[in-house]
Curated annotation (Swiss-Prot):
UniProt note on regulation of activity: Allosterically activated by N-acetylglucosamine 6-phosphate (GlcNAc6P).
Functional description taken from the UniProt entry: Catalyzes the reversible isomerization-deamination of glucosamine 6-phosphate (GlcN6P) to form fructose 6-phosphate (Fru6P) and ammonium ion.
Name under which the protein is recorded: Glucosamine-6-phosphate deaminase
HAMAP family tied to this protein: GlcN6P_deamin (MF_01241)
Coiled-coil region: none
UniProt family annotation: Belongs to the glucosamine/galactosamine-6-phosphate isomerase family. NagB subfamily.
Pathway assignment: Amino-sugar metabolism; N-acetylneuraminate degradation; D-fructose 6-phosphate from N-acetylneuraminate: step 5/5
Species: Vibrio atlanticus (strain LGP32)
Alphabetical UniProt keywords: Allosteric enzyme, Carbohydrate metabolism, Hydrolase
Residues annotated as the enzyme's active site: D72, D141, H143, E148
Length: 266
């Protein structure tokens, strides 16, 4: 596991965007051999999406031969609802880049049969072989995608009941009213995520400090699903200084020295 300890959340977005652009450009994707990118929603990746849009407009990267898969979607709210994850992705990213519509893959939270929809999504991912890079965020309780505490670490795309903590955290997007936050969601599984060639998780803010501690210094534990990153051969966590508050000083120092060349220009 790599840990990229930076000072500010804006630097996390800048570093993550540069890493994605390098991976895409080094891959040299074509229509027949696209780069497959997994994407999250939420507040944390917004700085990364903004930086990616700027790099695209500067001619540094094209998304024409990039295929995307999103992590999750609420069940039961209209696709055009302002807080659906479909709306989030188009508003904050897809509408500003040259990605082809047919290359965008999103879970359908209004499917007639949710189990069939989850299988369709898994099969679509498998049709590309694997996801080359999956970017994610993490919840205060260590959940990744909507894999809440006690989720199976070998789970696949499925329906999940959202915890009260998650619904309270997400109520800020629903006028502060938890009753407006859906109780269920479709989400990729931890096993689905671990199948990716590379996983990059963004962690910002002091409220994520316990989750970061569990991911880096704790044992692999289904109560902190982000800890499953320890099982992956190519995982990277990009964090800001407030998120490191629960880590040992020597842990932060170790990774700061290890990644010095990769963070010196930020």
């Amino acid at each position: 596991m790599r840990l990229i300890p930076l000072n500010q959340a804006a630097q996390v977005g800048k570093w993550a965007a540069a890493h994605i652009v390098k991976r895409i450009n080094d891959f040299k994707p074509t229509a027949e051999r696209p780069f497959v990118l997994g994407l999250p929603t939420g507040g944390t990746p917004l700085a990364t999406y903004k930086a990616l849009i700027e790099l695209h407009k500067a001619g540094e990267v094209s998304f024409k031969n990039v295929v995307t898969f999103n992590m999750d979607e609420y069940i039961g709210i209209p696709a055009d609802h302002p807080e659906s994850y479909r709306t989030f992705m188009y508003t904050n990213f897809f509408n500003h880049i040259d990605i082809q519509e047919e290359n965008i893959n999103l879970l359908d939270g209004n499917a007639e049969n949710n189990e069939v929809e989850c299988k369709r999504y898994e099969d679509k991912i498998k049709s590309y072989g694997k996801i080359n890079l999956f970017m994610g965020g993490v919840g205060n309780d260590g959940h990744i995608a909507f894999n809440e505490p006690a989720s199976s670490l070998s789970s696949r795309t499925r329906i999940k009941t959202l915890t009260e903590d998650t619904r309270i955290a997400n109520s800020r997007f629903f006028d502060g009213d938890i009753n407006q936050v859906p109780k269920y969601a479709l989400t990729i599984g931890v096993g689905t995520l671990l199948d990716s060639e590379e996983i990059m998780v963004l962690v910002t803010g002091h409220n994520k400090a316990l989750a970061l501690e569990a991911a880096v210094e704790g044992s692999v534990n289904h109560l902190w699903t982000v800890s499953a990153l320890q099982l992956h051969p190519k995982s990277v966590i990009v964090c800001d200084e407030p998120a490191t508050q629960e880590l040992k000083v020597k842990t932060v120092k170790y990774f700061s020295e290890l990644e010095a060349e990769n963070i010196k220009d930020l």
